[in-house]
Amino acid sequence: MDGEMAIIESSNHVGTSSPTTETQFTIDSSALKDQETKESITNSPTSEVPIETKLPKSSDIVTEEKHPQNTTTDIENEVENPVTDDNGNLKLELPDNLDNADFSKLLEFDAKNDEALFNSNELLSHTMDPVNNIDLTHDHSREVSSKEDINIEPVNPDEDEREKTQDNTAAVKTEGIRNSEDTSIQKDEPTADAIYTDVHKLSVNKDTETLPTLVDEKNNMLHMRNNSITPIMFQQHELVGQPPQNTVTENNSTDAETTQRKLSEPIDASLPLPNEQPTIFAYARLDFQSFTFYVQTLHAIIGRRSENDFSHKVDVNLGPSKSISRRHAQIFYNFGTGRFELSIIGKNGAFVDDIFVEKGNTVPLRNKTKIQIGQIPFQFILPEQERNDDSKSPENADIAESEINTRNLKKNEPKSKKKITTGAKPKKAQTKPAVKKEKKPPKIPKKVYTLEEIPVEYRTKPTVSYSAMLTTCIRKYSTAKGMSLSEIYAGIRELFPYYKYCPDGWQSSVRHNLSLNKSFRKVSKEGKGWLWGLDEEYIAERERQKKKQSEIAVAKAQAAQLKLEQQQHKLQQVPQRGKKDIVSQRSNVNARKQNISQTLAANRAASNRKNTASDNQRTMKYLQEQLVILTRDRKGLSKQVIAAILTQALAMTINQVTQAAKNKGITGNPLTALMDKNPQHLNLILAAAVNAATAKVTKGEVKQLVNPETTAAAALAAKAQHSKPIRQPIVQTPHVPDRPPSQLSASASSHPNNYLHDKQPGSFDPSSLSRFFQPRQNARATSSVAATSVPAAASQNVDAQPKPKPAQDNDLESESGTSSSSSSSSESGSESDSGSDDGSASGSGDNSSTSSESESESDSGSEVDEKNNKNEKIDSESIKNNESKDDIPSKDENSSNDNREISKTDEEGHDSKRRKVSEDINEGITEVNVSLEEKL
């Protein structure tokens, strides 16, 4: 045997058969229940080999063979009366006269009785149970006979060649589930242990990547894992999908799929052994219907991989369905919670254990969690369950271990001739046949036609709209259930062959028209899409509208044609008419001009209305603000009383100004003009109206709510802040000696009939409104008279810079005034002029004001004349500029200013006029109050 040693472990392998002799060893099952049985048989075709067997005392070995009776009897005697050595081991002694030929015949099998010898009735199922329960640690106690105790004799070359042929034709059968019996040959336990240790060390040093080493590493990793995230190994028989291409699996279910090997050749370690499965390291796996994905990273993206866009990285491609987003979900390991989690990114969500999860939510993943994205379901598998399954079936580990040891022993002894097997027919493995993965055929791109391949009549796009195409297609090919999108596409290609050759893209326009055009409706649902049909009612209504519109268009066209014919007929009659046509043309031109003027007038009227409305709003706002300012001191009156007072005061003011302007024949908005030109006097009118309304509302309890003196002072101060002083020209006047104060007081007391002088300072003077609405008169040159009548006081202060008028002087002018009618008229002129844009009131205040109320009549008259002469030109210019807007005439000087002494008759005339104006104003105020009360 060339000094080699072979140990054959009986599993589910069928031994080689010899054509001449047949030997079978049947071991009683009762002998295997108490202790382990090991047999070691070393065969050599031409040499005598001593056989040592360690058997229990109760073991029975029955040998059946077709040989002479004397040989069988000798062997039976040896078995019945075993010979033991010094250590108590059984020893089989062979006679010296047993030659080589007789020994070889003893080991040959008979092919005729092969099936009878291995009858399944002789081995029961309970016989194999003790063997299956043998611990893995006992497998390492296999002992091998020593090399020195084996007698090796030369081998006959002829027989060696014959044995090689027999070995080459031997069929090795591998089974999925193994029931093995450990048999070994042992001569001496200490010697065998030492030999096993040497052999084991030799095999480890020879190949560190053998299958036993890998299996040991797997077992150690399973125990060391302890629920960590270390990738676990998946065995191929545990998977659902197709095995990888670099793995080789064997189906052990039938005898037809057995593999034949030459026993003389060494087994290549790179090739997988029968029943060996490839190992895949992964954290988890995703089981789909047609494939399996191994999660080998802590983060995996699930989605739809685009054919054209490679920017989106997808680890698990779920197909081209548009219901799946490019990045639909992600599986990641959460170190905080210590588990895998699923986060939904796609807008359509996903189902996790038949529960819908919306976009943006994250759910934990457990073992065997069912997930469905779109129409694709799959299962999440964790390796812990796989480890538990492995621990539940230790017999599988025993079988794998015994098989690996058998392979290693075969490698050491390739020329074994005899194999002793036990047991009945092993069960066939129930492994599923490997299902080849059917790859989806790649999407065939549409053929791009060249211009020569397209027929000439189909090279241009039809002028029909998509809605018309769809209507024609659906009416021609539609059924009662409707048409799907693919059917509509096919129908359009059939009706309009242009779309057979044109590139894709028109389908989106078709879908757009189907969804937005009301002529098409969804009839029924089929699968994921809808079947489309026509809305005949809507189409009929559209047809009626189109027909009506066409009729109207035809009527308009006929009317236009008739009008054109009439114009042509008139043109033909032009020579007959002659001059009449020329006159008519001129009249048409005049009419056109008139129309233009009317249009411009209308535009001006509209602009005037806008300006009037804006002026009214501005005036009312100003009046309201001033009323609020005037009534800050409410003197304990309630809000209701103050509101009534303000309402009546506002009505009185508007009514007084409007009535005065109406009596004078002035049009426009006099209140706005007064506010723009003289706001100080408007404030005085408001103050007087507030006092009158207070006395009326409170029924005399409160006679005066506003002090006119403080009102005038505040108004002048506000005007002085905003106005700029105007330099007046220097006027040379003759020197007039100053009058003593006694004369001034005498002249002031010489007019006891002065209306304004005798009136109380807190009362309202209705006649003050008439000063602003005097009729326009031609300005007269009074410069010479004014130059001769300037008092000495004015000549002394003429070179001084103009200053704002003091509040007390203004009050004296507005309330007390002068003692004559001429002084009152001149005073009204001075006050109206002081409200102009030039701020002349502030400039002339120094000349017109006096230090006491006893100023003489002549002095006051001369001062007023001087002021009127200075401001005459300015007033005339302002009147011209504002005449178109406000229609407010300027206040010209009174003719009586030329005379320093006024007769009593003129004074009485002025008094009568003032009385009449006051009566009219009072009547107007009453009417306004009544109308306001009705409105409120």
From Swiss-Prot:
Q: Tell me where it resides.
A: Nucleus
Q: Where is the composition biased (Polar residues)?
A: 9-29, 243-257, 742-753, 765-777
Which UniProt keywords are listed? Answer: DNA-binding, Nucleus, Phosphoprotein, Transcription, Transcription regulation
What is the organism of origin for this protein?
Saccharomyces cerevisiae (strain ATCC 204508 / S288c) (Baker's yeast)
Q: Please explain the role this protein plays, according to its UniProt record.
A: Acts as a transcriptional regulator that recruits coactivator IFH1 to the promoters of ribosomal protein genes. Recruited to ribosomal gene promoters by RAP1.
Q: Which GO terms describe its biological process?
A: negative regulation of ribosomal protein gene transcription by RNA polymerase II; positive regulation of ribosomal protein gene transcription by RNA polymerase II; regulation of DNA-templated transcription
Q: Where is the FHA domain?
A: 300-357
**CDD domains the UniProt entry points to:** FH_FOX, FHA_FKH1-like
- Stretches of Low complexity bias are at 779-795, 815-853
* Protein's UniProt keywords contain DNA-binding: yes
**Modified residues annotated as Phosphoserine in this record:** S44, S228, S264
Q: Locate the compositionally biased regions of type Basic residues.
A: 416-430
Name under which the protein is recorded: Pre-rRNA-processing protein FHL1
Gene Ontology MF, one: transcription corepressor binding
Higher taxonomy: Eukaryota, Fungi, Dikarya, Ascomycota, Saccharomycotina
The cellular component terms of Gene Ontology attached to this UniProt record, alphabetical and capped at eight, are: chromatin; nucleolus; nucleus
